[in-house]
A protein has these predicted regions:
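Structural recognition of an alpha-helix C-terminal capping motif at a helix-to-coil junction
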Residues: 36, 50-57, 70-82
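Internal acidic/polar
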Residues: 4-5, 86, 94-119, 150, ...
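Arg/Lys-rich amphipathic alpha helix in sigma70-family domain 2
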Residues: 64-68, 78-99, 111, 119, ...
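Short, charged helix-capping/linker segments at alpha-helix termini
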Residues: 2, 14-25, 35-54, 162, ...
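Sigma70-family region 2
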Residues: 16-17, 40-43, 54-71, 90-92
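C-terminal edge and immediately downstream basic/flexible tail or linker adjoining helix-turn-helix-like DNA-binding
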Residues: 2-4, 14, 96-103, 127-128, ...
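Helix-turn-helix DNA-binding module
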Residues: 46, 128-139, 143-164
Length: 194
């Protein structure tokens, strides 16, 4: 058994035994990456923070099921992805509020001379394009291209084959390219008409 696997099993055992210091260690080691994942999947800081708390509450309840077959971080990612996808499905009917606060940002230049609204619109375009991806493709894309996980790890996190992960990342990139290219073309047409 590798040292990191032994450390994962020992940390999980300490958490199960009620060692608050161990759970704090677990939280500090993984909270930032899990928050980042939740934020990128949800596009909303408040929702990501709420979900992060739910993820760690769930982890605390489910640590009994951790057997050490995968790294503790991978197990947490899988738990997080399941909760995130459940949350996304439950709110599928609600529209995201991507434009809050943009009305006042339009005329403020940043240090590079770009308008803040232009950067916000770029971010909104990306968020909208990501939101149009199927859940599996979006999750695989974010885990691979944003979080830096390997396809094998993504397979473990999402419960899919390594080849499926590769396929979903590829499909996500193609669809994002198509959606963002379409958005640029639409903006260009609108600006030509002014």
């Amino acid at each position: 058994m590798s040292t990191s696997k032994e450390a994962d099993l020992a940390l999980a055992a300490r958490c199960r035994d009620g060692d608050l210091g161990a759970f704090e260690e677990l939280y500090k080691a993984h909270a930032a990456r899990l928050y980042s994942l939740a934020f990128r999947m949800l596009g909303n800081a408040a929702d990501a923070e709420d979900l992060l708390q739910e993820i760690f509450l769930s982890a605390h309840r489910k640590l009994e099921s951790f057997r050490g077959e995968a790294a503790l971080g991978t197990w947490l990612y899988r738990l997080a992805m399941n909760q995130i996808l459940d949350y996304v499905r439950s709110r599928a009917g609600r529209a995201g509020q991507l434009t809050d606060g943009l009305e006042d940002a339009g005329t403020l230049p940043d240090a590079g001379g770009h308008r803040l609204a232009d950067r916000a619109i770029d971010r909104i375009d990306l968020e909208r394009a990501l939101a149009e991806l199927p859940d599996g493709c979006r999750a695989a894309f974010l885990l691979h291209d944003v979080e830096g996980l390997e396809h094998k790890e993504i397979g473990q996190v999402l419960g899919i084959a390594e080849g499926t992960s590769k396929s979903q990342v590829h499909k996500a990139r193609l669809k994002l390219r198509r959606l963002l290219t379409r958005n640029v073309a639409e903006l260009s047409e609108r600006s030509d008409g002014l």
